[in-house]
Regions:
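Intrinsically disordered, low-complexity protein-interaction/activation regions
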Residues: 8-168
Length: 168
């Protein structure tokens, strides 16, 4: 048995509500993007993988998740996506547009914070086990298996920190 909690008789509405609020794996809210970071990075909506026109749009979203909601400048994002190779301004605008339009098509406009040329992820508007760990809702050893966004090199620093924390 893998119970998240239990209720002792007499059963009351309050006891049921309390246990539902403290589920190990909470019930996903409708219209909430689900982001998986442990292992490969993947984005799901209603249980299905989200398709982006450009693979770099998915990488852009992955980096924003890795930054944990911090606003990132276009210059920083281009340096990560193109590894300091200049001359990708127009391509970056297409990638950014693809990300925003894909999220809009899923009615997930509130996932990205946009402020004066900076982008960040709105942590409260997505479901992500990494964010649950950061917020203290789950223990690292319950969600981390030694891999974090394995397809992206920028994730190596975070992965090494998670590995160190999990080894303690």
């Amino acid at each position: 048995m893998h119970a998240s909690g239990y209720i002792v008789k007499p059963i009351t509405t309050e006891k049921v509500k309390r246990e539902l609020l403290n589920l190990r794996k909470p019930v996903l809210e409708v219209n909430k993007l689900q982001i998986e970071v442990f292992g490969n990075f993947e984005v799901y909506f209603e249980g299905k993988p989200v398709k982006f026109k450009y693979s770099k749009a998915k990488e852009l979203l992955a980096y924003l998740v890795d930054r944990k909601g911090a606003l990132c400048s276009s210059k920083e994002l281009m340096a990560i996506l193109f590894e300091d190779d200049d001359g990708h301004g127009t391509y970056f605008k297409s990638i950014r547009k693809d990300l925003l339009e894909t999220l809009k098509s899923l009615d997930c406009n509130n996932v990205i914070n946009i402020q004066r040329g900076k982008l960040g992820i709105s942590k409260e508007n997505v479901y992500c086990t990494y964010f649950d760990y950061l917020d203290g809702k789950v223990k690292l050893n319950e969600v981390y298996n030694g891999e974090y966004m394995t397809q992206y090199s920028f994730s190596e620093y975070t992965n090494s920190n998670l590995y160190r924390l999990n080894s303690k």
